[in-house]
Design a protein with these regions (language model features):
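FMN-binding flavodoxin-like domain, especially the glycine-rich phosphate-binding loop
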Residues: 4, 10-13, 17-32, 37-132
């Protein structure tokens, strides 16, 4: 599993909480600035988080996601506070055809991180991201 963040302090806290919530599963947490295109290939499940929409560190990640098909992979998105950041992340993964969890995680709901993260991993929502 892979968690990619913008590297912001609050986003990193949520990423750590998600990784901890997944228990014994191997989870790699990466700042987007350290992301390489082949990091995402072995990940059946990945999470993306940012504090604000269009962080500069996401430029390469955005380019990769525009040119890769990740159909069948599961994805959860999160932000410490920004609905616009979540809208950005949702649009970012739209073209790569991931199965996007319909409910993003916000910092205000960090108490429910474990349930949310496990739901993303289980794929029980199984809705392909068809929104435009």
């Amino acid at each position: 599993m892979l968690i990619i963040t913008d590297g912001a302090k609050e986003t990193a806290k949520i990423a750590s909480a998600i990784a901890a919530a997944l228990g014994d599963v191997k989870v790699e947490v990466k700042a987007a600035g350290d992301f390489m295109g082949n990091d995402i290939l072995p990940a059946d499940v990945f999470f993306l988080g940012c504090e604000n929409p269009e962080p500069e560190t996401f430029a390469y990640l955005a380019d990769v996601l525009r040119h890769i098909n990740l159909a069948g992979r599961l994805c959860g998105i999160f932000s410490p506070k920004s609905e616009k950041a979540v809208q950005y992340l949702s649009a970012l993964v739209h073209d790569c055809e991931v199965a996007l969890h319909p409910e993003p995680l916000f910092a205000s709901s960090v108490d429910s991180v474990k349930t949310w993260a496990q739901n993303v991993v289980s794929g029980s929502f199984c809705t392909r991201n068809d929104s435009k």
